[in-house]
């Protein structure tokens, strides 16, 4: 699928990046927008978190099925169908205020999200040369992260200046753009998922590979903290009377991602993930604590820079680590596990941290969420020390 072993930026890889940015931007605008819309509609932050949880759990359940069928489906056709499916779901939600119906639609959108993102990740990793896997996944991760960070920011800005209906209209347009780009995808039988023999395996073997478990669990912990930011940063901003300025948090993260990702991918390939995970963890802890104690836009912005550095490094490093630990025919499985772990972190973080916020306030919640990163770095350190001992033995 690529003309040169060492070439990364082929036309097809660039196309996948464009589709990924557009699709993630759409879905994350909906994630941030639905949470705020339902919270204001019901005057219940927990219901706002349920909207995110329903969406993410649907994606988590869907991904293993996608991994099982990866060898049997026409990826381009399924991708196009799922994009149209998500478009129809958004159209139905336009003008609706019945919360059970909106939750049901979010579940359906989660199914579309789970299938589509797994297909895009597998297409991308099969286009990336092995010797540039860290760099390639870094760029793919930048595409997903730009959508993930800019989406909530744009949603906040639109809701402050326009309406939820206008936000839905914009997301419909983005899905149409993604669909248009997807028509130009070319799938050849030389892809690793096409040329790898299909082995007789149990259901568990199809959807799970223990070699990818640790990086997937660690990225889940990180995304629990990010869920707290996506779903509740607006509430903290209202307490501090920042208004629409709170959306700058996501803009700063997006800028940091663009600046950091190209370098972090090369560091991963040349030096390994340990030179990225340790400093990123420290930045994340400091960033969350600064959010908790921020009393103005300056401290808020510094927190965004530090957390943005962590976000820029964590997601692609753990995903590349997971993919590198499995065989070629299990790349789809590793990608599905990694993406499902991110979704699980978002799904668990929303209601759990929402409950914590109800007890301690938003500041207490962000302070306590930093403990998740402490657990992450301790588990990573334990694995790192174990690897060192095994190398010396």
Residue ranges: model-predicted function:
Residues 9-49, 226-235:
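Helix-loop boundary and gating motifs at the non-cytosolic
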Residues 56-64, 148-149, 254-262, 347:
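Residue-level signature of mid-helix packing/kink "hotspots" within the transmembrane helices
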Residues 172-192, 379-383:
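C-terminal membrane-cytosol helix-exit motif in multi-pass small-molecule transporters
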Residues 77-91, 275-289:
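Structural signature of the two symmetry-related core transmembrane helices
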Residues 62-74, 261-272:
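Helix-to-loop junctions at the C-terminal end of transmembrane segments
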Residues 107-143:
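Cytoplasmic helix-loop-helix junction between adjacent transmembrane helices
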């Amino acid at each position: 699928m690529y003309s040169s072993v060492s070439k990364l930026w082929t036309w097809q890889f660039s196309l996948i990046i464009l589709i990924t940015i557009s699709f993630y931007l759409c879905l994350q605008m909906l994630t941030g927008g639905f949470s705020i819309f339902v919270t204001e509609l019901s005057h219940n932050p927990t219901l706002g978190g349920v909207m995110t949880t329903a969406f993410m759990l649907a994606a988590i359940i869907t991904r293993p099925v996608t991994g099982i069928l990866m060898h049997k489906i026409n990826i381009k056709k399924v991708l196009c169908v799922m994009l149209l499916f998500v478009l129809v779901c958004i159209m139905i939600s336009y003008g609706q205020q019945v919360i059970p119906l909106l939750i049901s639609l979010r579940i359906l959108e989660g199914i579309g999200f789970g299938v589509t993102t797994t297909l895009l990740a597998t297409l991308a990793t099969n286009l990336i040369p092995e010797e540039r896997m860290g760099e390639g996944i870094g760029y793919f991760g930048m595409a997903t992260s730009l959508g993930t960070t800019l989406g909530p920011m744009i949603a906040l800005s639109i809701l402050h200046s326009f309406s939820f209906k206008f936000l839905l209209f914009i997301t419909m347009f983005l899905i149409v753009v993604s669909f248009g780009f997807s028509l130009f995808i070319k799938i050849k039988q030389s892809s690793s998922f096409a040329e790898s023999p299909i082995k007789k395996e149990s259901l568990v073997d199809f959807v799970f590979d223990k070699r990818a478990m640790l990086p997937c669990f660690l990225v889940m912990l990180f995304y629990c903290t990010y869920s707290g930011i996506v779903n509740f940063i607006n509430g903290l901003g209202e307490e501090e009377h920042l208004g629409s300025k709170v959306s700058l948090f996501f803009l700063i993260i997006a800028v940091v991602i663009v600046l950091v990702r190209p370098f972090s991918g090369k560091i991963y390939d040349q030096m390994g993930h340990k030179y990225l995970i340790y400093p990123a963890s420290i930045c994340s802890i400091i960033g969350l604590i600064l959010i908790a104690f921020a009393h103005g836009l300056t401290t808020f912005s510094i927190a965004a820079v530090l957390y943005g550095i962590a976000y820029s490094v964590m997601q692609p490093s753990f995903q590349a680590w997971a993919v590198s630990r499995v065989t070629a025919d299990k790349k789809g499985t590793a990608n599905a596990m990694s993406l499902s772990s991110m979704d699980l972190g978002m799904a668990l973080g929303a209601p759990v941290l929402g409950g914590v916020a109800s007890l301690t306030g938003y500041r207490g919640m962000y302070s306590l969420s930093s403990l998740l990163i402490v657990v992450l770095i301790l588990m990573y350190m334990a694995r790192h020390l174990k690897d060192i001992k095994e190398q010396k033995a």
